[in-house]
Amino acid sequence: GQGAYICGEETALIASIEGRRAEVDVRPPFPVVEGLYKKPTVVNNVESLAAVAAIFKLGSEAYKTIGNGRSLGTKLISLDGYFNNPGLYEVDLGTPISFIIDEIGGGFNDDIKALQIGGPLGGIVPVDILKTLTLDFEAFSEGGFLLGHASFVCIPKSFSAVEYAKHLFAFTAHESCGKCFPCRLGSVRGKEMLESAIEGKQKFSEELIYDLLETMEVGSLCAL
């Protein structure tokens, strides 16, 4: 995969290990039934495997006390340069986002309008929601966001939201494996639509963008 974003999806990762093009496979069969070289395969990320050592050391009952009762354990987070204390931290799942921003990150060093949490295709969370949001999978799912790998990327007020959305479409177009045409074509079309709006060639249509996003999500295999 040579660092391809799509290899964050388990079947694409398996394809890459086998020497095939890094593309998503249809499921079922799932990797636990038929995975690497057609053998049953368990795919976990490094963070999950690292938690296994803590569970063996502390015991499962003690480990269950870490977190908020819904999401258990800890989560690595990374804070970008718009925080006064940027860096990599480990926090309990269920920690309030406001605590992460103010106490761990030391607040922002610029006027921020939103945070993108969870990677290049993670959720974009407006600042007015951050005060009530907690760092756990359930809270993010209920809010319509993805927690992902919990990177915190700040979007300053001075940066155009449309320009930022264009950047995300461009990233998707570059990283698409190309197997599903809604993603392969939709990402390019989304980038073109936003470019035209920025350049004043056509009016920005929120409805068209949402229709395109829904088509890409429903019509693709991985919906990354």
Which residues are covered by each model-predicted region?
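Terminal amphipathic helices with adjacent charged low-complexity linkers/tails
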Residues: F108-G143
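Ferredoxin-type iron-sulfur electron-transfer modules in oxidoreductases and energy-metabolism complexes
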Residues: L133-L224
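Flexible, glycine/charged-enriched surface loops at secondary-structure junctions
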Residues: A62-R70, T74, N109-G118, K179-P182, ...
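Hydrophobic alpha-helical positions that pack around
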Residues: G1-L93, G105-G107
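Conserved structural-core and active-site-/substrate-pathway-adjacent residues in large, well-folded domains
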Residues: G8, I100-I101, C180, C222
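Short, structural beta-strand-to-alpha-helix junction motif
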Residues: D92-I100
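Short, surface-exposed loop/turn segments at secondary-structure boundaries that line and modulate
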Residues: Q2-I6, A12, I117, L121-P126, ...
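Intrinsic disorder at enzyme termini
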Residues: P28-V32, L36-A51, F56, D111, ...
